[in-house]
A protein has these predicted regions:
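Glycine-rich phosphate-binding loops that contact phosphosugars or nucleotide phosphates
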Residues: 1-113
Length: 113
């Protein structure tokens, strides 16, 4: 499930702060043995750190896509796929897009093969 509903994001940010927008959604919807894909170019995004912390408390696995080695998010993820590329965040995001396509293809093969 993509956490991208503008109404949810706006209401949650307004009521609880932007730091909690993703963790509140996961809290309401995820269960143990689910998997969260956390994507952050810097690896320092507070809202992504919060959702990773929540997942760790609840036994929810986290795969992170980051752009900096040893970032806070990479340290609290079960698996970090890091694409360090200096100060070029656009390159990191392009690589993340490719990785997401590969992950989707792998999941589809596993589910529908």
């Amino acid at each position: 499930i993509s956490i991208s509903d503008p109404s949810f994001l706006t209401c949650t940010a307004n009521d609880f702060g932007y730091k909690s927008v993703f963790s509140r959604f996961v809290e309401a919807n995820a269960v143990k043995n689910d998997l969260v894909l956390a994507i952050t170019t810097s690896g320092n995004s507070e809202n992504i750190i919060e959702v990773c912390k929540y997942c760790n408390l609840k036994g929810i696995k986290v795969i992170s896509l980051t752009g900096k080695l040893n970032s806070p998010v990479s340290k609290i993820s079960n698996c970090d796929i890091c694409t360090p590329n200096g100060n070029y965040s656009d390159r990191v995001q392009e690589l993340h897009g490719i990785i997401i396509h590969i992950l989707v293809e792998l999941v589809e093969k596993k589910l529908f093969a």
